[in-house]
């Protein structure tokens, strides 16, 4: 009976809001129309569907990803990271769900939602929120920025999986976006996520000075000084023999293709949180370390894990002849490099509040110890 009452209540609310929307639609500005559409979206999607998604898919995904971070590491550090990460991921998932309603063009929005709500560790948006709080800011100030970097990241995955790029059929254990919706819709949905990311970022409640800097950081991270440069170098290096390349080539690819957006995520969080120039620079150097760390671990996993364990096609880098750390220096030396990057990352966090720094240290351990 209680469930029926809840259903009737939601139905009444929805019909009432729908009447208001259809009555006022022609009289509203585009910005207010968009807000009203999102309001109509909330009763059906956010409290029910998004909450169920956040508790089920995200928890299951993180349960299988988080290992060792709740125990003491080699430095004697201990932090209960799992509830922290799940809480942040749920906040981000709800915000993403509200940001991308099921409206026309329906097939594009379905593809956008399929790609971005398909699970995932949410490392970049969590890094953005943690960096904001590290320098004394509030989570609410950085939530739009956190969503923006995840939209950009998802766009990059859609493009990366296309037949003309890495030609992958699996992502997060599910068929890739172009396999479900077709290449043309996948490309359009990626472009839509890119545009929406900047639109969403500009809705953050911060000063124009901080906003301009945040937009610049994000744009730089995905252009020819960031992600695009790394992807171009990655593609041009396919099939080269080990003697034809060096560590500097490999580091260039990883720092730009993977590290640039991780760096931007942290820096934008610190900027929005009101960090000093010295604090922002320390956060930037920390993020550069974990950006490279993330990709080195990715290279190791691609070499040592199965497709079932990874949730994506295993061994594809080796088959494609891509440059990876195991290919250039071997698996064991790659693991040693992981430990060095962990130490370097921690050093850049010295001088910050000991409690506020804990999530970032735990995130570093999570990235290093993840199994997919």
Swiss-Prot record:
Function summary: Catalyzes the trans-addition of the three molecules of isopentenyl diphosphate (IPP) onto dimethylallyl diphosphate (DMAPP) to form geranylgeranyl diphosphate.
Details of cofactor binding: Binds 2 Mg(2+) ions per subunit.
Annotated metabolic or biological route of this protein: Isoprenoid biosynthesis; farnesyl diphosphate biosynthesis; farnesyl diphosphate from geranyl diphosphate and isopentenyl diphosphate: step 1/1; Isoprenoid biosynthesis; geranyl diphosphate biosynthesis; geranyl diphosphate from dimethylallyl diphosphate and isopentenyl diphosphate: step 1/1; Isoprenoid biosynthesis; geranylgeranyl diphosphate biosynthesis; geranylgeranyl diphosphate from farnesyl diphosphate and isopentenyl diphosphate: step 1/1
Gene this protein is translated from: GGPP4
GO molecular function term, any single one: geranylgeranyl diphosphate synthase activity
GO cellular component: endoplasmic reticulum
Annotated Mg(2+) 2 binding sites: 160, 166
Protein name per Swiss-Prot or TrEMBL: Geranylgeranyl pyrophosphate synthase 4
GO biological process: carotenoid biosynthetic process; farnesyl diphosphate biosynthetic process; geranyl diphosphate biosynthetic process; geranylgeranyl diphosphate biosynthetic process; isoprenoid biosynthetic process
Enzyme class: transferase
UniProt-annotated binding residues for isopentenyl diphosphate: 121, 124, 153, 172
Record-listed Mg(2+) 1 binding positions: 160, 166
Pfam families tied to this protein: polyprenyl_synt
Location of the protein in the cell: Endoplasmic reticulum
Keywords: Carotenoid biosynthesis, Endoplasmic reticulum, Isoprene biosynthesis, Magnesium, Metal-binding, Signal, Transferase
Superkingdom classification of source: Eukaryota
EC number: 2.5.1.-, 2.5.1.10, 2.5.1.1, 2.5.1.29
């Amino acid at each position: 009976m209680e469930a029926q009452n809840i259903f009737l209540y939601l139905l009444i609310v929805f019909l009432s809001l729908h009447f208001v929307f259809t009555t006022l639609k022609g009289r509203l500005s585009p910005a207010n129309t968009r807000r009203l559409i999102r309001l109509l979206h909330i009763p059906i999607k956010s409290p029910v569907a998004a909450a169920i998604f956040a508790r089920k898919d995200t928890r299951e995904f993180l349960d299988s990803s988080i290992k060792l971070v709740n125990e003491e590491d080699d430095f004697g550090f201990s932090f209960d990271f799992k509830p922290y990460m799940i809480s942040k991921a749920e906040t981000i998932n709800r915000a993403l769900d509200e940001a991308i309603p099921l409206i026309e063009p329906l097939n594009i929005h379905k593809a956008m939602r399929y790609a971005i709500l398909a699970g995932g560790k949410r490392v970049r948006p969590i890094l953005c929120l943690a960096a904001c709080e590290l320098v004394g800011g509030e989570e609410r100030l950085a939530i739009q920025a956190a969503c923006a970097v995840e939209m950009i990241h998802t766009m990059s995955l859609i493009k990366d999986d296309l037949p003309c790029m890495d030609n992958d059929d699996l992502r997060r254990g599910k068929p890739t976006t172009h396999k479900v919706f077709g290449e043309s819709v996948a490309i359009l949905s990626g472009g839509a996520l890119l545009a929406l990311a900047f639109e969403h970022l500009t809705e953050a409640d911060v000063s124009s000075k901080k906003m301009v800097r945040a937009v610049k950081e994000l744009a730089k991270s995905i252009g020819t000084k960031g992600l695009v440069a790394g992807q171009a170098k990655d593609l041009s290096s396919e099939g080269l023999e080990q003697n034809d390349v060096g560590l500097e080539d490999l580091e260039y690819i990883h720092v730009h293709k993977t590290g640039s957006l991780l760096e931007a995520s942290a820096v934008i969080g610190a900027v929005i949180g009101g960090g000093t120039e010295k604090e922002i620079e320390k956060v930037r150097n920390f993020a550069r370390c974990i950006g490279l760390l993330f990709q080195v671990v990715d290279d190791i996993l691609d070499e040592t894990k199965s497709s079932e364990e990874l949730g994506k096609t295993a061994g594809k880098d080796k088959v494609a002849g891509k440059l990876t750390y195991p290919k250039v220096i071997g698996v064991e030396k790659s693991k040693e490099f992981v430990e060095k990057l962990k130490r370097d990352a921690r050093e850049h966090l010295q001088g910050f509040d000991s409690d506020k720094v804990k999530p970032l240290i735990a995130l570093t351990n999570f990235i290093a110890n993840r199994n997919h």
